[in-house]
């Protein structure tokens, strides 16, 4: 696992650079910390049974990953532990490139920058996430020529009491391919999840979500979803795992 910041309520990795490599984390200079790494994307593999009896397992690979890389590389950086008054600041900058394992006419470069501003108090946390990507979306491994994407979100949580809490998120994603606009779109989303914790074990959640996708070609798409769940966990709070959930979901998409 490497540089995979995730938003919980919409289960989105707004950056993801899992792979093989090396780097340094939390290198401290005057209180500001730096993460730097060079990583390669692992080559995918379809497991097959081989006839060669010299291989005890007789399986080419496990899961969907091989042991080598596929020629897509990333240099990733994160600068954090920055204080701007009551605001915590994180800055991301990543660069993607290809090796000779990729055909010369298919090699591309990509880069992305990200900014996270967060504020924490006794009642909860609020966070703003901004990401700009050139020739990529949420990973500089996966490159598309002349693609520009922007992601912005506001998320947070608030404790009215220890038992009554709410999580919320607003998100925007702009996908703009300058060479092929057939899939160009702007995505708007909103989620709210009020939660009530009856005790350290049982809780009830009601989650409501709405999404609108505005395509350059093909019009708009709207959808909503409502989920009611009864949950069992060891600990009072949405972060405790494992959690056993019993839920019913309803929704509609145009």
What positions do the PLM features span?
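Detector for outer-membrane/organellar transmembrane beta-barrel domains
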Residues: 80-215, 222-226
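Predominantly the C-terminal beta-signal and adjacent terminal strand-loop region
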Residues: 220-254
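Residues that cap or initiate secondary-structure elements
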Residues: 42, 97-99, 136, 236, ...
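Outer-envelope exported proteins of Gram-negative bacteria
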Residues: 35, 169, 205-207, 243-247
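Outer membrane beta-barrel
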Residues: 1-54, 58-92, 245-253
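Generic domain-boundary/flexible-linker signal
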Residues: 47, 102, 179, 217, ...
């Amino acid at each position: 696992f490497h540089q995979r910041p995730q938003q919980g309520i919409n289960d989105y990795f707004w950056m993801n650079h899992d792979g093989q490599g090396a780097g340094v984390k939390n290198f401290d200079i005057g209180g500001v910390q730096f993460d730097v790494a060079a990583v390669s994307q692992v080559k995918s593999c379809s497991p097959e049974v081989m006839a060669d009896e010299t291989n005890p397992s007789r399986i080419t690979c496990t899961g969907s990953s091989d042991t080598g890389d596929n020629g897509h590389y990333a240099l990733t950086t994160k600068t954090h532990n920055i204080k701007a008054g009551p605001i915590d600041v994180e800055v991301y900058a990543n660069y993607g490139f290809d090796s000779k394992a990729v055909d010369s006419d298919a090699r591309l470069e990509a880069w992305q920058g990200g900014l996270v501003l967060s504020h924490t108090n006794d009642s909860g946390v609020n966070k703003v996430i901004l990401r700009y990507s050139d020739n990529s979306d949420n990973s500089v491994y996966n490159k598309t020529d002349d693609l520009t994407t922007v992601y912005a979100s506001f998320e947070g949580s608030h404790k009215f009491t220890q038992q009554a809490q709410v999580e919320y998120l607003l998100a925007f994603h702009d996908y703009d391919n300058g060479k092929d606009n057939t899939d160009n779109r702007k995505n708007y989303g909103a989620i709210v999840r009020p939660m009530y914790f009856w005790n350290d074990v049982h809780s009830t959640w009601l989650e409501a979500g709405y999404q609108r996708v505005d395509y350059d070609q093909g019009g708009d798409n709207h959808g909503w979803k409502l989920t009611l769940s009864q949950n069992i966990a060891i600990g009072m709070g949405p972060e405790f795992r494992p959690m056993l959930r019993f839920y019913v979901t309803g929704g509609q998409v145009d």
